[in-house]
Swiss-Prot record:
Biased composition (Pro residues): 236-248
Organism: Homo sapiens
Protein's UniProt name: N-alpha-acetyltransferase 80
Pfam family, one: Acetyltransf_1
Noted disease: Auroneurodental syndrome: An autosomal recessive syndrome characterized by progressive high-frequency sensorineural hearing loss, craniofacial dysmorphism, developmental delay and mild proximal and axial muscle weakness.
Protein keywords: Acyltransferase, Cytoplasm, Deafness, Disease variant, Transferase, Tumor suppressor
Expression (tissue specificity): Strongly expressed in heart and skeletal muscle, followed by brain and pancreas, with weak expression in kidney, liver, and lung and no expression in placenta.
Length: 286
């Protein structure tokens, strides 16, 4: 039985006997051509669309966010992409940046279009350290996801060192939970916790002071109890009492004193953040 599917204008048949013979001569192979139609496909590299080149490390600059208010939104988006947070809260935090610290720095790349504003590719925040006038605490370090692993993080940290050293600071502190080896390659070592100063002024705002409970009023000192042993009433004389037995010796075993400073491991830490996640405190002299 012959089954023929007729299509117009060409005829399509599935009968093997009616199939055309294909010659095996290589010189008689059918010729395949691409007929350009409404949409033309070409593999010519000269006609391919140009990809946006990655920014050059040499062209990066570091600028405070409060000096470029037009980039505030872009900086907030960059940080929220790593640590999601209310946009209003993030903008408020960035708006606190000032030359008196805390200070937010942006790593900027020139836009491919010369007339456009630069692109925010990184961010870090610097805060003063309590009781350490020559130290700064580095926080909220982030680089755009598409540019990670290409040297932008190192460029950002090196720029922070230059920025801090030019203003008289000699040590940087930071915390991390998964980038210990990255900071170790930059010269950081494990350190002790420090407290960053949130306010730019040494005096706390009055609104904050009013939030604390007032100190209790002083109470008159209590009279110390008289511990002087009073003489017992004398009774009839008798034989003297025997002396009391000696007190037993206190058997305490003190722990051995370590011969040197406690060893610190890059894999273990005793510190945790507010969420209970282990963190490493690191520091570097600059």
């Amino acid at each position: 039985m012959e089954l023929i599917l007729s299509t117009s204008p060409a005829e399509l048949t599935l009968d093997p006997a009616c199939q055309p013979k294909l010659p095996l001569d290589s010189t008689c192979q059918p010729e395949m051509t691409f007929n350009p139609g409404p949409t033309e496909l070409t593999l010519d590299p000269e006609h391919q669309p140009e990809e946006t080149p990655a920014p050059s490390l040499a062209e990066l600059t570091l600028e405070p966010v409060h000096r470029r208010p037009e980039l505030l939104d872009a900086c907030a988006d960059l940080i929220n992409d790593q640590w999601p947070r209310s946009r209003t809260s993030r903008l408020h935090s960035l708006g606190q940046s000032s030359d008196a610290f805390p200070l937010c720095l942006m790593l900027l790349s020139p836009h491919p279009t010369l007339e456009a504003a630069p692109v925010v590719v990184g961010h870090a925040r610097l805060s003063r350290v309590l009781n350490q006038p020559q130290s700064l605490l580095v926080e909220t370090v982030v680089v755009a996801r598409a540019l990670r692993g290409r040297g932008f993080g190192r460029r950002l940290m090196e720029g922070l060192e230059v920025f801090a050293r030019a203003r008289g600071f000699r040590k940087l502190h930071l915390t991390t939970h998964d980038q210990v080896h990255f900071y170790t390659h930059l010269g950081y070592q494990l350190g002790e916790p420090v407290q960053g100063l949130v306010f730019t002024s040494r005096r706390l705002p009055a609104t904050l002071l009013n939030a604390f409970p007032t100190a209790p009023s002083p109470r008159p000192p209590r009279k110390a109890p008289n511990l002087t042993a009073q003489a017992a009433p004398r009774g009839p004389k008798g034989p003297p009492l025997p002396p009391p037995p000696p007190l037993p010796e206190c058997l305490t075993i003190s722990p051995p004193v370590p011969s040197g400073p406690p060893s610190k491991s890059l894999l273990e830490t005793q510190y945790q953040n507010v969420r209970g996640r282990p963190i490493f405190w690191m520091e570097k002299d600059i």
